[in-house]
């Protein structure tokens, strides 16, 4: 007033309590960013999923928070603590990372189907051998996957799901055999043919024109001596754990 200023008491601002209207995704694994929408996200101090504090969070606006799910999480409520109080909304499902316990065979070539055992395989999005994606894979169950080896490399077997990745060491990639040449190129039953090439390890079959050799001896990874059976004109074939190779021209 013209006579001065009178005051009484103090003014206290009481912030409105936060609310959560939604969060996406509702199911997530460690490292996933969840977008939480709601109101009154001022002075946020805690964000948690299933009682486990988020690894980190960013308040984008008073109506949005982006929070990263922590490892070792749990299913349950999404919780936000702000200046106005705490809000908890149920419905979050934590997806644990998969584990890989074993696989067979442990050595394989291109096209071989490998059976992988473990846990948490539901919803698998990728399988790799030595860092090379599988040519194809099928989730048989939450504990088993069958995967086809692509042209790859030795190393870890890895399974990836929305919950993360699980790996196990010990896979050996077997390159397919190759035939450089064979002599003689024409031979009768009982004759020995010398086949030269590459990757003649673990040979399981040799044939001439589709007829299995009477016998064969792997001299080295680059040479096979094979005895012609009652054969036919056609391809010379060598099969190993890494695959089968055909070379035409035998009569």
Which residues does each predicted region cover?
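Ser/Thr/Pro-rich low-complexity tracts
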Residues: 1-251
């Amino acid at each position: 007033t013209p006579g001065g200023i009178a005051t009484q008491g103090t003014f206290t601002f009481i912030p409105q309590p936060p609310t959560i209207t939604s969060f996406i995704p509702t199911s997530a694994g460690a490292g996933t960013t969840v977008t939480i929408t709601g109101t009154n996200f001022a002075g946020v101090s805690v964000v948690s999923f299933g009682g486990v504090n988020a690894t980190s969070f960013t308040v984008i606006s008073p109506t949005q928070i982006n929070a990263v799910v922590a490892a070792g999480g749990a299913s349950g409520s999404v919780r936000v603590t702000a200046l106005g109080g705490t809000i908890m909304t149920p419905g979050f499902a934590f997806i644990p990372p998969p584990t890989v316990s074993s696989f067979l065979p442990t050595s394989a070539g291109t096209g071989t189907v490998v059976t992988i055992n473990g846990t948490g395989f539901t919803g698998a999005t990728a399988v790799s051998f030595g860092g090379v994606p599988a040519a194809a894979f099928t989730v048989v169950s939450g504990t088993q996957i069958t995967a086809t080896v692509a042209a790859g490399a030795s190393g870890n077997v890895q399974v990836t799901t929305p919950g993360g990745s699980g790996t196990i060491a010990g896979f050996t990639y077997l390159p397919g055999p190759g035939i450089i040449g064979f002599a003689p190129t024409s031979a009768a039953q009982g004759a020995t043919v010398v086949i030269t090439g590459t990757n003649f390890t673990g040979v399981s079959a040799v044939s001439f024109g589709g007829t299995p050799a009477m016998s064969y001896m792997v001299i080295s990874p680059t040479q096979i001596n094979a005895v012609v059976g009652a054969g036919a004109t056609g391809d010379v074939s060598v099969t190993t754990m890494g695959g089968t190779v055909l070379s035409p021209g035998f009569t």
